[in-house]
């Protein structure tokens, strides 16, 4: 099973999404968005930018 994005509307009325791994575990959570459309745009942005993203490991600093 592949991963998926789950879009939710919180009690505050704002939207956010989680990226779930194939096993259902949350591996990323977005910021909160004022509109559903903005949250969907955020999902598309992750889909577009993540495949070529490099890792900037700053854990030793």
Language-model segments: which ranges?
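Generic structural motif recognizing short loop/turn segments at the entrances and edges of beta-strands
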Residues: 1-4, 51-53
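Short arginine-rich
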Residues: 45-56
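Short, charged, surface-exposed hinge/linker loops at domain edges
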Residues: 59-61
């Amino acid at each position: 099973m592949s991963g998926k994005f789950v879009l939710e509307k919180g009690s505050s009325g704002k939207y956010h999404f989680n990226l779930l791994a194939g096993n259902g575990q949350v591996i990323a959570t977005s910021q909160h968005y004022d509109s559903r459309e903005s949250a969907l745009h955020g999902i598309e942005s992750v889909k577009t930018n993540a495949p070529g993203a490099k890792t900037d490991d700053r854990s030793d600093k």
